């Protein structure tokens, strides 16, 4: 609903999210070790070309836009276990369900859900917290697992703006 009413139907929110995501996605990526810049590294190669579907800019635009719209961004890492992945994919936050653990603050798993069906389950290592899915979230004082979207915090103002626009359009259509 936030994506629809806040992002798709509100030009101000759409512009804000896109401006921030576009600017952040164009930040130059540099890698350093001990104060020395490293110019050739598999991680840099991966970030410059995350997958066949996404270039660097498109990948980071999606990551940042999802974070701003939902308060959560999920990145799927494809590759051999305990090694540098060879592909990265941003996952739609509305399709991710976090399975809370019975004890502790780490989730048990991340589930990828489409049309109400769990398509994939990505387990979380109980000792290290590592998973094929990397979860980036904004602070949420009321939820241990999901981030709080800036759009949610502004939802009343966004609703008011949308309703005012609908009212003004109705007046114009009725010749007022």
Tell me the role of every PLM-derived stretch.
Residues 1-176:
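Structured, contiguous alpha/beta core segments that scaffold functional sites
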């Amino acid at each position: 609903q936030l994506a629809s009413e806040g992002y798709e139907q509100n030009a101000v929110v759409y512009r804000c999210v896109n401006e921030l995501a576009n600017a952040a996605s164009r930040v130059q990526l540099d890698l350093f070790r001990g104060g020395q810049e490293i110019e050739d590294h598999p991680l840099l190669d991966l970030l410059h070309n995350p997958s066949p579907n996404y270039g660097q800019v498109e990948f980071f635009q999606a990551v940042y836009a999802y974070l701003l719209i939902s308060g959560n961004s999920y990145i799927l890492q494809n590759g051999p276990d305990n090694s540098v992945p060879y592909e990265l994919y941003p996952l739609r936050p509305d399709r991710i369900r976090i399975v809370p653990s019975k004890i502790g603050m780490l989730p048990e798993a991340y589930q990828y859900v489409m049309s109400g069906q769990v398509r994939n389950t990505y387990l979380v290592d109980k000792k290290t917290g590592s998973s094929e899915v990397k979860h980036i979230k904004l602070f949420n004082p009321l939820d241990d697992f999901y981030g709080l979207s800036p759009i949610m915090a502004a939802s009343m103002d966004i609703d008011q703006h949308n309703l005012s626009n609908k009212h003004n359009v109705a007046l114009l259509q009725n010749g007022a």
